[in-house]
Amino acid sequence: MSDETLVNDPVNPEPARPASAAMAPPIVASPAKRIQAFTGDPDFMTSLARGLAVIQAFQERKRHLTIAQISHRTEIPRAAVRRCLHTLIKLGYATSDGRTYSLLPKVLTLGHAYLSSTPLAISAQPYLDRISDQLHEAANMATLEGDDILYIARSATVERLISVDLSVGGRLPAYCTSMGRILLAAMDDTSLREYLGRADLKARTSRTLHDPESLFACIQQVRAQGWCVVDQELEQGLRSIAVPIYDASGQVLAALNVSTHVGRVTRSELEQRFLPILLAASRDLCHQLFG
């Protein structure tokens, strides 16, 4: 998502067009129906609820949407969607090319305050900083949010940044990331197959594993060994290793990883030098959180 120059909301409303296969499917239990359930509440702000629903209509795989597509996904009338988008543009949260709309990085600030202040993120930050200082690479923590991973804490040395540089609140697809596969490995087999059946599995590089059966076998291996390396599957040149963070009952709560460039760190070094540091940090953090 690039930071683009804001343009005015198109003056002419988009003409109606029939729903097609190219249009994103409506969200189950649509926002419009959930909003309608509060019509009897005099303190409920329908306009605010609609604005939030419009923001949530955008996904990693649907970054550019038309008014018709957003209306289809949310079941909110097009006129209301248009007003929401106009407001988001004026406030610096969205932009338009005259037909499609996309969110701007400023929208991440809406969730940053919460994510960075959760007990897990607060407790994890010193460990991430220590890992980053020790290994001179970016250290991250994420949870599973729908079909994506959601970054909840991060520490990165300025001189080592690579193009995949997500701030707290950023998202990436779970299937092709080391933290994502750790979190997917915590699912039972039925839930995992359901995920692989609905997720948009595509080759982001020539090395991306995107066949459902191959991914299922890979994630089962991750589950058995307790850690995961993803080597240039998300982005050419990007290599990462991840481990799980457990809660008091032994369930996977989040994932912790270090990402690096292939020109700096070999896969063997990831496993021999980075992995013990990550496992120790995971163990110490779990002990701090749950005793």
Swiss-Prot record:
Gene3D superfamilies: 3.30.450.40, Winged helix-like DNA-binding domain superfamily/Winged helix DNA-binding domain. GO terms for biological process: 3,4-dihydroxybenzoate metabolic process; catabolic process; negative regulation of DNA-templated transcription; positive regulation of DNA-templated transcription. Pfam families: HTH_IclR, IclR_C. Residues 1-22 are annotated as: Disordered. The keyword S-adenosyl-L-methionine does not apply. It comes from the Bacteria. Positive regulator of all genes within the pca regulon, pcaBDC, pcaIJ and pcaF. Also required for the chemotactic response to aromatic compounds. This is Pca regulon regulatory protein. It comes from Pseudomonas putida. The gene is pcaR.
